[in-house]
């Protein structure tokens, strides 16, 4: 006997269900998505802000991240979750300030700050809106330690990524 309509009162929503057909309207695609990291040591001068050169892609589903300009330019309008992480290797130097910023079209929109010594890590994340054509996002960092220090490299320490969470 086929069931065409089920009353909502007769279903326990806490149960597990096994479907044999196609389920539509559940979930969605989280693309474009990207994740890029910096595999090479780079020295950052004291009191200097730089665009972080994450030039190696782990993921770029829609060719929206440029490894030469370090820009994420999504071609789908919507809301995106973006994240960034940077780690400085300083030995025993005390930092006056380390900033990590995600910019939209060159303007700071998400930022975090840390005052620390030794290995200092800063991360930032948030939800941003993109128009799907000309908006672009970059990751930049500033350090004020009294001297030049290196950004720690590898995909687990310095990276930039994001993905679509809702089309607009």
Region annotations inferred by a language model:
Residues 75-77, 103-107, 129-136:
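A short, structured loop/turn motif at beta-sheet edges
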Residues 18-79, 83-94, 112, 147, ...:
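Terminal (often C-terminal
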Residues 119-138, 142-144, 153:
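Short, surface-exposed tryptophan/glycine-enriched loops
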Residues 5, 66-68, 96, 120-122:
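Residues that act as N-cap/strand-start positions at coil-to-secondary-structure junctions
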Residues 93-107:
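Short, surface-exposed beta-strand/strand-loop-strand elements in extracellular ectodomains
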Residues 81-85, 99, 125-127, 136-138, ...:
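Beta-strand secondary-structure signal
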Residues 1-27:
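Register-specific beta-strand positions within repetitive beta-rich fiber domains
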Residues 110-117:
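Solvent-exposed serine/threonine-rich low-complexity stretches and specific carbohydrate-binding patches
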């Amino acid at each position: 006997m086929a069931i065409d309509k089920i009353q909502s009162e007769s279903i326990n929503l806490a149960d597990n269900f096994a479907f044999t057909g196609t389920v539509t309207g559940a979930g969605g695609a989280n693309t474009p998505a990207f994740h890029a990291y910096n595999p090479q040591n780079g020295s950052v001068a004291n009191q200097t802000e730089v665009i972080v050169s994450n030039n190696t892609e782990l993921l770029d589903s829609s060719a929206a991240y440029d490894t030469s300009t370090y820009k994420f330019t999504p071609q789908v309008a919507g809301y995106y979750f973006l994240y960034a992480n940077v780690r400085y290797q300083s030995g025993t130097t005390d930092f006056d300030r380390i900033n990590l910023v995600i910019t939209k079209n060159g303007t700071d929109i998400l930022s975090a700050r840390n005052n620390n010594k030794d290995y200092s890590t800063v991360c930032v994340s948030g939800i941003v809106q993109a128009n799907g054509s000309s908006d672009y996002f970059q990751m930049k960092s500033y350090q004020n330690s009294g001297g030049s220090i290196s950004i720690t490299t590898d995909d687990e320490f310095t990276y930039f990524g994001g993905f679509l969470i809702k089309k607009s």
